[in-house]
Regions:
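TRNA-recognition modules of translation machinery and tRNA-sensing kinases, especially anticodon-binding
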Residues: 1-167
C-alpha cells in the first residue's frame, strides 16, 4: 500500500469513533426537530440516473458529476444535492399522496468540484421540502424555514465538526 492509499481521496473524510458519534448526535437532533415540525423523513439512493441531476433548470452540468454505468449501460451519477432526487421521488412514488407533502432528509451528497470555503467534497446534507402548498397556508413552513436558518447559525460550529450541512 502506497502512502497515498493511507488517506482518503481529496475532499473525502474518515471518521474516528468519537467523530462518528458526534456526527450522528447532530443528525439525530436535526431529525427530531424536523419530525416535531411535521416533516416525515425519506431517503433516496446515492446513485441517480444522470439526467435527473444534470442539464438545464439549475441542475449541474454532466462534467461536474461523479458518473458510472449500470449493467444496461445507463449513465448514473452520485447525487450532488438532494432536492432533485427528492422531487423525482415525490413525482413518482408519492404522486397520489394528498398535498401538502412535507418531507425531510439527512443524507450524504458528493460534489465533483471542491466546494468553496474548505467544505468537504462529500458531506451530509439535511433539509426539508414542502410540495403542493402555497399562499397563507405555507406560513408555518416559512417559519420552519426561518428556524432552519437559525438552527444553521446556532449549530455552525457543531456542523463544521460533524460534516453535516443544512439546506
Amino acid at each position: 500500500m502506497t502512502r497515498q492509499n493511507l488517506f482518503p481521496p481529496e475532499g473525502m473524510q474518515d471518521y474516528l469513533p468519537d467523530e462518528r458519534w458526534h456526527k450522528r448526535r447532530v443528525e439525530a437532533q436535526i431529525r427530531e426537530l424536523f419530525s416535531l415540525c411535521g416533516y416525515d423523513e425519506i431517503e433516496t439512493p446515492l446513485l441517480e440516473y444522470c439526467d435527473v441531476v444534470s442539464g438545464g433548470g439549475g441542475r449541474l452540468p454532466v462534467e461536474q458529476l461523479f458518473k458510472t454505468f449500470d449493467r444496461s449501460g445507463s449513465v448514473l451519477a452520485v447525487r450532488p444535492d438532494n432536492t432533485l432526487p427528492i422531487a423525482r421521488l415525490i413525482a413518482g412514488r408519492m404522486k397520489d399522496v394528498p398535498a401538502p407533502i412535507r418531507v425531510s432528509y439527512v443524507q450524504d451528497i458528493v460534489q465533483y468540484p471542491l466546494p468553496k470555503g474548505g467544505q468537504m467534497r462529500a458531506h451530509t446534507q439535511a433539509g426539508i421540502e414542502l410540495m403542493g402548498e402555497g399562499g397563507a397556508q405555507a406560513d408555518p413552513s416559512r417559519t420552519l424555514w426561518n428556524l432552519d436558518r437559525a438552527l444553521t447559525a446556532c449549530l455552525e460550529p457543531l456542523l463544521k465538526e460533524s460534516a453535516v450541512s443544512l439546506t
